Structures are given as structure tokens and as C-alpha cells.
């Protein structure tokens, strides 16, 4: 169920979008991985570069086609001029991702305009696509320019074959970065010394920035300023609006691990991610910006860290003062770590996933050796950041005890009373029946996530 990435339904949607572009005269072309389209696609998505003058029309067409094909939920992630358009149809286990690219601009620097790129496009089946020569040019530039370079083997082959097959590549590179740097880069490509080529990426970036600025100085200044203002606004000032955070809470043995595995698998499928994309950042209990207190004690020679994690209540509660220091330490980690790491997750369009959360300080203080009044623990938790969604896995105490005997039956029952009370305090909490198979709970949780983080079409 979770394996299909592109089939005939995807092809019909893509075909209808491009046909509509052609009907009303919107110029576009597909970038890379077009072989086999419309019904076969070696990639998980499709990148379409669209004439910048038709941004609104192109987006409206895509949304109308999604609706016409039964897409129920829509999610969009924007990275500069790249609009990643996700469509989801949960009832039919279907997901599609089409990236509409309205300018190929990296951190404000534009090397090629749309018109310049369009000159290197050609027809393929019923689509307009970027030709093989400029596909190689774009792979060479944009897998290095302005970012830490990483080259898959397939990209190395594309770059090498472009160099060998198209004499214009060498001349273009000289025009972009100058003769001396071009010769060093070309020599590395010729001998397949790609590690050496990547060592020149910083020089390449500087040369390309200089080229872009000389080509259109005022526009480049404007685009660079807009890039950093937009990024700063999103990540620093408005990260809460864009964050996709949720946590899972329950007594040990309730099936959190299995539930999360199933849920993250579904998120990856319906948001068209590969595991290597790392679109789900999983935290355990807290952000862990600050180290474990046990590790600090071991490092300063106070005592050896206790790593027997099979018994969560293995240690005696700390004294009153020590407990206050502990909960203050956790509060600081949540405040600093959440604000830092979730901002980073927003920057890279990741889900922030917490396996357990600060609510454990209320329901299970023995785990963290706290001996403080309930009202104190509640106050500290209230003053911490909170995820947008909290899933509470509610199961019969006997079922929980049968799965894992780390806690006594009466302790499981006690914790569940507290968790249930917590789940009634705010609409961020969603109680799920954990007596049933994890797949069913994950399906229900997925619908909550879609309702929270996507739009209905």
C-alpha cells in the first residue's frame, strides 16, 4: 500500500495540467526525469519550470486539476520561487507532488532567465522538456552553487557525459566563471576526479555570483535582499505558523514505538518523501539541546551514568532542591531547544516529532526523579513550548502490562488517569484507542495531521 509513487493516475493529472498550460499559452518545460512520462516516472515527483509572468494562472490550473481528479487535501511548501505542491487522496492511498518553479534563483542569484532556459527545451511526447545538454548544465551548477555540494553517482555521470557529448559545455563554463577556473574544473571532470571538482565549489559559487551580479546588478541586489528577508521572517519571526510539530504520549508499553513507525511511514508516503529526505525529525522526550544530567555528572566525576533504561523507575526520587534544579534544567532545554531545533525543521520543511514530551513531568515524575508538588510541575510544563498536536495512546492497563512489564499494573492505571485528564485540557490533544492494531491508530492520526497541516480542496 505504501510503495506506489507514480502510475497512470499521476500521468493523467500531469497530462491535464500541461495540456491546460498549452491551451492558454503558458510556456513551461519539465526539468529532468521525463523519460517514460506520462505514465512512468523514475523519480517520485515532477519539476515544472513555468514562465514567471503566469505564476497565479499556473497555480490556479494545478489546483483545479487536483480537484477534478479527486484530490482531497493540498499542502504547499515554498522555497523561494519553488512551490512544492502536494496532493493527497487518503481514501485511495494516493499522493502526488509536482514542483512549480517560477525562476531558477539560488539565494537571490539568477544565472539563467526563464527565456534563456526555454531556448534549450524541446518536445517529448505531449510535453515540453529541457534538453539533455542543458539538463547537464543545470545539474552541474545547481548541485554545487550556494550550497554544500553532494553528488550522487547519477549526477556525476550526467556531468561527465555532458562534458564529453556537448562541446558547448566547455565554452559556456568559460563564459560563466572565467578561463582559469573553468580549465581546473574541466580537467577534474575529464579525469572523473569529482572530489577534486567539489573542492572548487566555493570558487565556483563566487564566480557565479559575480556573473549574476554583473548581468543584472540592481535585480540581483533586490533578489538577495528579498531572499534573506523572507527567510528571516519565516524561520525567526513566524516559525510557529509554519511548524509541523506533534508528540505522542502514553505509559510505557502502550505501543508508542510501533505506532510512530507506522505513522511516519504513512507521512513519508502521503507527503511523497523518501526516508533519506529526513522530513521527519524525531526527538525523544525533549529537544536535547542540553546534555543529560547523568552524562554531566559522569563527565565531572560525580558518579557513573546509569544506562539501565529497561526500568524507567530504577532510581529514587531526588530531594526537593535537586528536583527543582532538574525541572528548571528541563524547562530551559525545552525553551531553548524547541525554539532552535523547530526553527531548523521549519527551514527544511520537516515534521518535528516528539516521542514523549514534557507532559511526562506531570504524569510520570518518577521517570525523571522529580519529587515536587503537582502544581509546580504543571506550572513548569505550562511555561514550556507545546507541539501543535498531541496524540495520547489510550489502552486497557492489562493490555499495556501484557506488552511490556516495565511498570506495575497499578502504576500504569495511575498514569492513564493523569494522561486522560491532560487530554481534556486542550484541543491539541487527541486520544487514540491503542487496544487495536497500530495501523488503525496510525490511520486515524494521519487524518488528524492532514486536517491540521493541509488544506481541504
Task: Describe each region flagged by the PLM.
Residues 259:
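Hydrophobic positions on the alpha1 helix immediately C-terminal to the Walker A/P-loop
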Residues 356-421, 430, 434-435:
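A glycine- and Lys/Arg-enriched "phosphate-lid" helix/loop adjacent to the NTP-binding pocket
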Amino acid at each position: 500500500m505504501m510503495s506506489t509513487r507514480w502510475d497512470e493516475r499521476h500521468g493523467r493529472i500531469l497530462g491535464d495540467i500541461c495540456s491546460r498550460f498549452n491551451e492558454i499559452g503558458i510556456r513551461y518545460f519539465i526539468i529532468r526525469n521525463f523519460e517514460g512520462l506520462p505514465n512512468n516516472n523514475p523519480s517520485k515527483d515532477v519539476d515544472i519550470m513555468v514562465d514567471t509572468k503566469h505564476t497565479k494562472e499556473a497555480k490556479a490550473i494545478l489546483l483545479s486539476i487536483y480537484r477534478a481528479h479527486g484530490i482531497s487535501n493540498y499542502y504547499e511548501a515554498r522555497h523561494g520561487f519553488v512551490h512544492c505542491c502536494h496532493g493527497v487522496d487518503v481514501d485511495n492511498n494516493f499522493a502526488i507532488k509536482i514542483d512549480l518553479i517560477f525562476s531558477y534563483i539560488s539565494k537571490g542569484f539568477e544565472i539563467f532567465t526563464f527565456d534563456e532556459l526555454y531556448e534549450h527545451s524541446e518536445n517529448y511526447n505531449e510535453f515540453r522538456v529541457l534538453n539533455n545538454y542543458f539538463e547537464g548544465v543545470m545539474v552541474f551548477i545547481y548541485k554545487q552553487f550556494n550550497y554544500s555540494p553532494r553528488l550522487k553517482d547519477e549526477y556525476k555521470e550526467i556531468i561527465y557525459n555532458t562534458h564529453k557529448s556537448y562541446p558547448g559545455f566547455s565554452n559556456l563554463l568559460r563564459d560563466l566563471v572565467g578561463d582559469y577556473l573553468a580549465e581546473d574544473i574541466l580537467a577534474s571532470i575529464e579525469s572523473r576526479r569529482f572530489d577534486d571538482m567539489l573542492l572548487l565549489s566555493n570558487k565556483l559559487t563566487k564566480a557565479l555570483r559575480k556573473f549574476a551580479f554583473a548581468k543584472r546588478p540592481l535585480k540581483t541586489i533586490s533578489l538577495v535582499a528579498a531572499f534573506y528577508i523572507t527567510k528571516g521572517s519565516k524561520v525567526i519571526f513566524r516559525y510557529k505558523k509554519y511548524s509541523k510539530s506533534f508528540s505522542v504520549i502514553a505509559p510505557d508499553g502502550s505501543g508508542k514505538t510501533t505506532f510512530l513507525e507506522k505513522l511516519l511511514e504513512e507521512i513519508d508516503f502521503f507527503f511523497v518523501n523518501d526516508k533519506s529526505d529526513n522530513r521527519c525529525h524525531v526527538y525523544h522526550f525533549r529537544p536535547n539541546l542540553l546534555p543529560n544530567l547523568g552524562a554531566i555528572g559522569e563527565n565531572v566525576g560525580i558518579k557513573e551514568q546509569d544506562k539501565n533504561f529497561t526500568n524507567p523507575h530504577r532510581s529514587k526520587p531526588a530531594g526537593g532542591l535537586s528536583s527543582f534544579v532538574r525541572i528548571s534544567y528541563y524547562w530551559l532545554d525545552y525553551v531553548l531547544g524547541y525554539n532552535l531545533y523547530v526553527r531548523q525543521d521549519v527551514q527544511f520543511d520537516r515534521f518535528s516529532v516528539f516521542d514523549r514530551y514534557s507532559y511526562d513531568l506531570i504524569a510520570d515524575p518518577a521517570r525523571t526523579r522529580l519529587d515536587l508538588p503537582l502544581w509546580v510541575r504543571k506550572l513548569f510544563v505550562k511555561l514550556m513550548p507545546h507541539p501543535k498536536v498531541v496524540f495520547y495512546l489510550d489502552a486497557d492497563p492489562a493490555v499495556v502490562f501484557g506488552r511490556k512489564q516495565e511498570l506495575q499494573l497499578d502504576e500504569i492505571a495511575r498514569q492513564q488517569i493523569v494522561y486522560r485528564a491532560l487530554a481534556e485540557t486542550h484541543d491539541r490533544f487527541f486520544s487514540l484507542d491503542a487496544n487495536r492494531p497500530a495501523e488503525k491508530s496510525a490511520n486515524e492520526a494521519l487524518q488528524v495531521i492532514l486536517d491540521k497541516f493541509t488544506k481541504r480542496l
